[in-house]
């Protein structure tokens, strides 16, 4: 929690500008290429990482495919996972996230900017439609990030049980 407060206070004067720009990109996503939107997210991410005095070390970057059309399936250990992945990933990607996160003001704009798919875990039909849409987009060359556990792990660095539906997109695309 201290790191989050440190990020906010160190970027206090940047927040209104960053918020406005993020909202603009999110509401006019069709005007900007995926690369331009990703560069904005990387810029905001860099500000947050520097503000929080975080050091992010990426390993295995050579394993990321050179051509687009892949899915990441990392473990979700904490609040900084997505910051770290955006920081080290050289290519743009989108995410599949639970729809409850659209109630969080900043995340709502980030997901809109990424053109993320929001999944309703209580609606099986909608969840399957999201998976079908992800399959189509991966085949078309778009990259995705899916936390296969479905939620953040609260007990440290121990992976939880993976949700079966998350791998359907990978096996079918």
Tell me the role of every PLM-derived stretch.
Residues 1-70:
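Membrane-anchoring hydrophobic helices of lipid-metabolizing enzymes
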Residues 55-173:
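Soluble catalytic domains of membrane acyltransferases
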């Amino acid at each position: 929690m201290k790191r989050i407060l440190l990020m906010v206070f160190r970027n206090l004067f940047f927040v209104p500008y960053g918020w406005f720009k993020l909202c603009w990109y999110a509401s006019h996503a069709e005007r900007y290429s995926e690369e331009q939107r990703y560069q904005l997210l990387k810029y905001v991410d860099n500000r947050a990482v520097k503000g929080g005095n975080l050091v992010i070390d990426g390993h295995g970057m050579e394993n990321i495919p050179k051509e687009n059309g892949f899915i990441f399936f990392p473990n979700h250990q904490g609040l900084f996972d997505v910051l770290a992945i955006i920081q080290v990933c050289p290519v743009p990607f989108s995410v599949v996230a639970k729809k409850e996160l659209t109630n969080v003001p900043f995340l709502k704009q980030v997901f809109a900017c990424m053109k993320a798919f929001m999944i309703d875990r209580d609606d099986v039909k909608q969840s399957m439609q999201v998976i079908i849409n992800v399959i189509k987009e991966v085949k078309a060359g778009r990259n995705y990030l899916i936390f296969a556990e479905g939620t953040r792990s609260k007990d440290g660095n121990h992976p939880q049980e993976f949700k079966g539906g998350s791998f359907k997109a990978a096996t079918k695309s």
